Amino acid sequence: MAERQATIASSSGLHARPAKLFVQAVQEKGVPVTIAVDGGSDLNAGSILSLMGLGASHGTVVTLKAEGDGAEQALDELVALLETDLDAD
């Protein structure tokens, strides 16, 4: 199982717009991905409701996990997305 940590860069955390963009990216990867905050349960990263319930604000460190073909590359790309301010236009 591949695992990566990322720091949420979006200025408002994983609220509606960044969460939507992240969920779309997860679903495009074709591998199951989970996300968790320190000490929390692994949640489905492909679910907007799970992401919104995570309560990840700017600067929160999250752990992503994935399994299967392409998991390493998928996580690298997802970490890069989370570490980009998705609120900046």
Each PLM stretch: what is its role?
Residues M1-S10:
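Short amphipathic
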Residues E3, Q24, D89:
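Long, contiguous binding/interaction regions
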Residues Q5, P32, V61-K65:
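Beta-strand secondary-structure signal
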Residues A9-H58:
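Compact, glycine-rich, soluble single-domain proteins
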Residues G53-D89:
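C-terminal structural segments of small proteins and small subunits
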